[in-house]
Amino acid sequence: MKYLLHIGANKTGTSSIQTMLAANAPALAKAGWVYPDFHRRHAAHHDLALAIKGHPGAGLPEGWRGRLARLTAAPDRRFVFSSEVLFRLVPPAKVARFFPPGQTRVVLYLRDHLGYMLSWYAQAVQGRNVTCSFEDYVQIFHQPLAQYLAGWEEVYGRDSLVLRSFSRAALAGGDVRRDFIGLIEGCDAADFDLSAAESNPSISGNLLFFKKALNAYMTAAEARTDPIPDEFGRLAALKDSFRGRFAATKAEVDLVRRTFAADRTALMRRGLRFEPMPEAVAGHASPDPDTLTEDMRLIKHVALETQMTFLTHAARWQDWHSL
């Protein structure tokens, strides 16, 4: 195979894999592989994925197709590309024009639906202007993963698609980075420096509640603007309750169970194994009324001390001024 194409999915350790690949060019080269620095953003090929889709905001300069063709023409090199944008947002037939079937092995990690939706919701609140509840988010963004998987299998064939379960028990050494290295022909995990991998924790608790409230005062473009999402990643380091899993009630878990029952069955038939869903999810309350005022004041204090960008938008919120 000339290409190893890692397509996600999101919330399956993709940032850790991409950071590891970007930091280990010598280990990859030892086995004849390259992780190209071709318009990488946050160590990933997101802009390339959007350009393949034809997204007007991809931002790649004119002539990128020719440069990509010249880059990958080297007969003595094989190439790893990675972007979770590919799995759900880019038609596989378009991807195949650049990474042809027969020359490409596609790698996809999927996680259980409950963990996926909890993590995706927290990420959406952090990085966009989402204001809806978790329950509403589950119903609005009900996207059967098996449906997308079928599209990739139709273009590349089942034998060329490596489907992996994102669970500690299923991963080599309980680590998605080591698991992925094992899929790169000729590579040995012992040659890789894994110290620089990114953890990318989800925001939680009252920080999640605050960002969701703040989102009502930002446009979609404003909420996505750098460095606002990263600012909330830094705020998550202030308290344990600002990061990790947020609590989900029995009703919320039951909603996820019902909503994705057919998809879960289809993926299990495809060979994935999922643990039974719990009755409820223990985690940080969002909001936590007992510490809400204290936490809001902490967020405001740190934001002012470090002159965070989101302060411009928080100024539109009357309650912010009274803290």
Question: Locations of the language-model features?
Answer:
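Anion-recognition interface
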Residues: 1-323
